[in-house]
From Swiss-Prot:
It is found in: Virion. The N- and the C-terminus of this capsid protein may be exposed on the surface of the virus particle. The central core sequence may be important in maintaining correct tertiary structure of the capsid protein and/or play a role in interacting with the viral RNA. GO terms for molecular function: structural molecule activity. This is Capsid protein. Residues 1-54 are annotated as: Disordered. It comes from Potato virus M (strain Russian). Required for genome encapsidation. Forms ribonucleoprotein complexes along with TGB1 helicase and viral RNA. GO terms for cellular component: helical viral capsid; ribonucleoprotein complex.
Amino acid sequence: MGDSTKKAETAKDEGTSQERREARPLPTAADFEGKDTSENTDGRAADADGEMSLERRLDSLREFLRERRGAIRVTNPGLETGRPRLQLAENMRPDPTNPYNRPSIEALSRIKPIAISNNMATSEDMMRIYVNLEGLGVPTEHVQQVVIQAVLFCKDASSSVFLDPRGSFEWPRGAITADAVLAVLKKDAETLRRVCRLYAPVTWNHMLTHNAPPADWAAMGFQYEDRFAAFDCFDYVENTAAVQPLEGLIRRPTPREKVAHNTHKDIAVRGANRNQVFSSLNAEVTGGMNGPELTRDYVKSNRK
């Protein structure tokens, strides 16, 4: 009886279990299609993101290459102007109140160089000359032209304080005597030669432009190759304190021209200074005669 009861219960459980299995709905095709659609959507989104990333990288590469392309390539860069200023350490900072302060190269670079020569007319001298020439009737816009004409005149004649000029300097619809102009230059610049030195580079370029060396170059003993060196202020052509031509010097003086000029200057100075041996020019000292000729033996310069 017990066995039959167990069999009946077992059969009942199996029947109930079968009913439950029969009651569970079976998966349909739509269930599988939805799962595939979700997976496909995620895959397509990942592919799209990858494509967009590649496009962005290509765009960045394109812009990078565009920035680097061009017909200009700067080589041998050595830029100093506009560089970032250095920040010195606390214990290296300068003390401008101490006379023994050691200035750095950075500090020295901020002090602009100013070329100055005491042997030529200053800006104040030239302003006096300009104002006085205006007062004599020279139009303001033609004052520099007159001054340059005077300097070129001295290139041919002389820049000596004993120069007695002839002629006149002209401008459109006007002229002024050379005596008047050179008198102003001598008075306001102390000597005429100081003004001529100031315009020596301008004189040099003018001679080369017109192939017009000093008129007396042959009489002064210069050779043809050195003729452009035959004026008083030749040794100031390369002086940076002088008035510079707009484009710069056409060419620099040659060593041969410098030798020729210095040789002639030495001879001329010794000839002019022969009376400097006297402490007084009174007749009791000079005897009414010029001093002895100052000579120099140039032959020894070639001996070894």
